[in-house]
Amino acid sequence: MAAEREPPPLGDGKPTDFEDLEDGEDLFTSTVSTLESSPSSPEPASLPAEDISANSNGPKPTEVVLDDDREDLFAEATEEVSLDSPEREPILSSEPSPAVTPVTPTTLIAPRIESKSMSAPVIFDRSREEIEEEANGDIFDIEIGVSDPEKVGDGMNAYMAYRVTTKTSLSMFSKSEFSVKRRFSDFLGLHSKLASKYLHVGYIVPPAPEKSIVGMTKVKVGKEDSSSTEFVEKRRAALERYLQRTVKHPTLLQDPDLRQFLESSELPRAVNTQALSGAGILRMVNKAADAVNKMTIKMNESDAWFEEKQQQFENLDQQLRKLHVSVEALVCHRKELSANTAAFAKSAAMLGNSEDHTALSRALSQLAEVEEKIDQLHQEQAFADFYMFSELLSDYIRLIAAVKGVFDHRMKCWQKWEDAQITLLKKREAEAKMMVANKPDKIQQAKNEIREWEAKVQQGERDFEQISKTIRKEVGRFEKERVKDFKTVIIKYLESLVQTQQQLIKYWEAFLPEAKAIA
């Protein structure tokens, strides 16, 4: 019966080409996968590294027939046990985890598996990654700041250099606190290196801030005015957020290029990062070619999860863009309100100076002072609208583009696998024709080619399964971070609005006696 079933096999343990990139990502995995079969053995078993769901494209795995009395693994998850419980030992891996400073809880809630029939059971598998994430928490003891923008050089050869300061207790770094000077092209070069390593295997690489030819040209050839200062501050804040998101990723944090960027006093000059260059034009051509290929590839998606997520991100992208436009309009209106308030304050002050009535003149002068203070409040609120809300939306519009990029790479991986299968079929047909035509001298060559393409088909299948598995984990981590970021920003934004309104009330309450004193 169900209680006497043996645990599922642990797999043959064959490594794939991508498993070396999986190290360190366990801390941030929050995707929960639904099992098709769950034995009621007292010891939970880990899934094989290359296990795929029944909805995955390609050859289907052998189905397991379940008894009707399926158990709800979380039906009575009420018992608290120590982390040293023997029931956890088969799940936890002995492999070394990334050097982080974890926060380890003293107790952990463990579900008890009871032989209890449920009318509508929901069975979940708690993977090794999720157990470790729950035990260790999403904490990386590393703080990164970008500050002190400095103009280096003159004319069109000038550029902005930024100080990147890192504070950490992670053992992978040589010091606990260090700072380096980096220019904007260095940030672009870092993103290019990380994307070339990890994007095509399913990792979501945070995008770097976009180049602005107009804004940087003003900084290079123009004098230091308010617009140039505002542009430099926007870029500094964007670069800081980019690095903070990058080091939050457990796999990217361990990349040697990232550590070199943070620690090395001198970096090789980043090349092919200019917008108006041969490499820049080539990138635009490649993007256009990828868009055309995406339209021509017709992937038979049989995994409902991927189909649902792609539609979800398409809708989310559209709504975020609409909200971003609205918030930018709000920022513009707030700045206009600030300018009009300043003009009103100036006019009220001039009227107060020309007024003969002493009490009325004093009241008008006080009104002008209040309006000047309100003008400052409007400027601060416009600043909060932009840096708290608008920039968050802008970042996530680019992040969702990166998410859709990994889905596109999965489609390319499937297309490569499909092409290998078609080529293998043609090779087998050619071999059959040779055997019918009795050409023994070419049959051996055909057999060798068939073996070669069979290996390519198997490798393509493994690559596709691995990138699908990685994307599931990455999307789960992305969703968790997205909710956390929006919650934090919305709370801060509402607090700024409340503070602004409270300050307005104080200003008007202080002015009210002056208005009543007019006689």
Swiss-Prot record:
Membrane topology: Peripheral membrane protein
Keyword Coiled coil: no
Biased composition (Low complexity): 27-50, 93-104
CC terms in the record's Gene Ontology section: cytoplasm; cytosol; early endosome membrane; endosome; endosome membrane; lamellipodium; lysosome; membrane
Function text: Involved in several stages of intracellular trafficking. Interacts with membranes containing phosphatidylinositol 3-phosphate (PtdIns(3P)) or phosphatidylinositol 3,5-bisphosphate (PtdIns(3,5)P2). Acts in part as component of the retromer membrane-deforming SNX-BAR subcomplex. The SNX-BAR retromer mediates retrograde transport of cargo proteins from endosomes to the trans-Golgi network (TGN) and is involved in endosome-to-plasma membrane transport for cargo protein recycling.
Cross-referenced Pfam families: PX, Sorting_nexin, Vps5
Annotated spans, Membrane-binding amphipathic helix: 278-295
Residues that bind a 1,2-diacyl-sn-glycero-3-phospho-(1D-myo-inositol-3-phosphate): 183, 185, 211, 235
Domain spans labelled PX: 140-269
GO-annotated biological processes: early endosome to Golgi transport; intracellular protein transport; lamellipodium morphogenesis; retrograde transport, endosome to Golgi
Xref: InterPro entries: AH/BAR_dom_sf, PX_dom, PX_dom_sf, SNX2_PX, Sorting_nexin_N, Vps5_C
Phosphothreonine modification, residue list: 101, 104
Family as reported in the entry's similarity comment: Belongs to the sorting nexin family.
Recorded superkingdom: Eukaryota
Protein name according to UniProt: Sorting nexin-2
N6-acetyllysine modifications at: 469
